[in-house]
Amino acid sequence: MVQSRKRFECFEWSKVNFNLRASKYDSVSEPQAELAHGLFDLSLDYLPNTPPVLLELGCGTGHLSFSLAGCFPKMLDCLDISKEMLQICGEKLRDFPSVKWRLFENDAEDFEPDTQYDAIYCSATVQWFKDLPAFLPNAKKWLKPGGIFALGAFGERTLQEMRTAYKEASGRPLSSEATFYSQKKLLSMFEKAGFSLESSAECIYSQGFENPTAALKTLNKMGVTGTGEKPLNRTEVLKLKEALLKTGNEDSAVNFSWELIAMIFRGD
């Protein structure tokens, strides 16, 4: 697999999906790792000078958690719906014996924290929320005065090649449990919840593969398994692979684009 960088169903279904793929997730989740690293770098100027109290929503296997622990926070709370992913995250955090950290197997939209935070981090997660606008006012209450919400999201141009190829192969739009928002839409939702934008960054990350089968297997290992309302038949699968080859270039036979959006919001 080749990568190149250009500039910077429901809750239970998702839980089972990510539990099954936890052990393979780190090996294929380069876009998620890139987004986490970019968000972390963007957020550093907005953290307090004293050791912060941090919350990470949808920590997964700990791409971002490891960097946050490296800040030696006063406390780091990490939350995810997947028990298996939390276990992998916990193994990484054990490299920081002096850091107090806690793991919560919980849906972010139902979480009830027992403390307030200097910063809430949420990277590569909001696409799975059932009702993001309803969640944001609650999250704002979890912040200390002057606290920040650091958001990393996949924009609406994410996986556009896959969606185009699927429509060409099947004649149907590709359905998905995930909702990809534009930066403008995210800004509108956060401002309506009382947040103010401090900083933002955006780029397209290109992920290349040696053949269509490798590309589709990688999406499956990531947990991106939407295949439309009915499965593709054999003929449609062959057409899908042929359509994906149209995305190739001199470096890779198949390419997927990921729109990476990082935004820092102030809670008051």
Predicted segments with their positions:
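Conserved alpha-helix/loop element of class I SAM-dependent methyltransferases that forms part
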Residues: E30-T50
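Conserved catalytic/acceptor-binding region of the Class I
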Residues: I148-E210, T225-R234
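Class I SAM-dependent methyltransferase SAM/SAH-binding core
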Residues: V53-D110
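A short acidic, Gly/Pro-enriched loop at the edge of an enzyme's catalytic core
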Residues: E109-I120
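N-terminal, positively charged/glycine-rich alpha-helical extensions of SAM-dependent methyltransferases
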Residues: M1-S23
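A short glycine-rich, Lys/Arg-flanked "PGG" loop and its adjoining helix->strand segment in the class I
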Residues: P133-P145
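A short SAM/SAH-binding and catalytic strip from SAM-dependent methyltransferases
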Residues: A119-L132
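Conserved Class I S-adenosyl-L-methionine
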Residues: V28-Q32, T61-H63, Y181, S196-D268
